[in-house]
A protein has these predicted regions:
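Outer-membrane beta-barrel porins/channels
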Residues: 1, 55-197
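N-terminal, post-signal peptide beta-strand-biased segments of exported outer-membrane/organellar beta-barrel
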Residues: 1-73
Length: 197
């Protein structure tokens, strides 16, 4: 097997017992939207995954890695153009943005129970931070703008159990079936917010 299957921890026993395996990827996305006077843009660059696997002893292997679990990357702005309003207040603009996300750090081990059937166990640690902010500004100094936002820091633990069964379907074919069950994850953390004008 030339690839790491990070979805099912039981799959990591299907490998050369003398080799180390690693996988790394990155992703990038640039988006810009505009409708009337409203604009939105986001630029993201993140790891896709980082994983490596090592053999432990015969018919057993281990794997560890890091991958994004969720992400937030947006920014939009718009202006008030109604002459009846800005004639008194001056130009008004609103801007909002959000960045950050959660990552999953994991470690797994698997063993062949008997020919074709393997069992894998995985420990997951979730962590990350999200920042969101909102700004309201006036060009007329007689009016106060507003700024508010918050930072959320979260972490939690979870697990996964995987099974995989492989059998031959001919001289050059094989069929692989697998299943995983994940435990519920209860995230905890703290929120720091601010509001001022």
């Amino acid at each position: 097997n030339l690839y790491l299957n990070t979805v099912n921890p039981a799959s990591i026993t299907e490998r050369d017992s003398l080799s180390f395996m690693a996988d790394f990827s990155v992703s990038a996305a640039n988006r810009y939207f505009r409708q009337s006077d409203a604009r939105s843009a986001s630029n993201t660059f993140n790891i896709g995954d980082l994983a490596f696997s090592i053999p432990l002893w015969r018919h057993t292997a281990a794997m560890a890695g890091l991958e994004p679990y969720s992400g937030s990357a947006y920014a939009y702005s718009y202006s008030i153009l109604d002459p009846e309003i800005i004639g008194n207040t001056g130009n008004i603009s609103y801007t909002a943005s959000g960045t950050g996300g959660l990552y999953k750090l994991y470690a797994a081990a698997a063993a062949d129970l008997f020919k074709g059937l393997s069992l894998g166990l995985q420990f997951n640690y979730y962590f990350g931070q999200t920042t969101k902010s909102f700004y309201e500004t006036f060009t007329n100094s007689s009016y106060n703008g507003a700024k508010n936002g918050y930072d959320i820091s979260l972490n939690g633990i979870g697990g996964k159990i995987g099974l995989q069964y492989e059998f031959s379907a001919g001289p050059r074919s094989r069929i692989v079936a697998g299943a995983t069950v994940s435990t519920p994850v209860k995230l905890k953390g703290q929120i720091e917010g601010y509001k001022y004008s």
